[in-house]
Amino acid sequence: MNIIITGASRGIGKAIAASFAGKGNHLFLCARNEKVLSDTVAELQVKYPAAVIHARPADLSEKEAAIQFGAWCLQYGIPDILVNNAGEYISGNIIDEAEGNLEKMMAINLFSAYHLTRTLLPQMIGVKPPEGRSRHIFNLCSIASMQAYCNGGGYSISKFALSGFSKNLREELKPHGIKVTSIYPGAVMTDSWSGFDNTGKRIMEAEDIAAMVLAATGLSPQAVAEDIVLRPLLGDL
């Protein structure tokens, strides 16, 4: 299968890429940091030699970059699975967060998925997948998409918006047989939690999220996991 994963150089995106690479799929990856992305591709290719991995550095917070990345992917084939994972967390309260923080959060956490998805959809809709298969779009939302909290600011607003995008997209694509799944992770050991001592396994690992994404792709064409909420066993922090 052809699988596009954004924000794939580290954290949840890298874990999802590894889970699909382990199945010998064709991967199309992007991230902003070219060096880290290149290192990730090399690591995955050694570990999963049956996978075919293409990668391109891109800052999807820029509209044209998102469109160009989508067009580049389409040169190789029509995606079976799209994972909109690119995102960033910057804490702050509405009253005093840095000027422009909301715009920045919206650009990377919402508009990146919006513009990339719009670029890919005509082909995903226009060409039917093989019998017994369906195309699938995953949007990596957050617990912050479901529950407001102090210090969430522009980040939480952007994630609420991404959840709304995902729900609207699901309704639009039902007649075309394309699944849309929203993932709502709680605390995950990624860069957002750098410095946190997780030796006691208080919060989740990126591989937990990847396992659920992979599992959701295994359902029959007539079934979809619409919303997947994952939290640490002991609850949110």
Where are these regions (language model features)?
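Conserved glycine-rich cofactor-binding loop
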Residues: 9-11
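Conserved glycine-rich Rossmann-like NAD(P)H-binding loop of the short-chain dehydrogenase/reductase
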Residues: 23-39
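The beta1-alpha1 cofactor-binding region of Rossmann-like NAD(H)/NADP(H)-dependent oxidoreductases
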Residues: 34-35, 57-68, 99
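C-terminal helical subdomain
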Residues: 182, 198-237
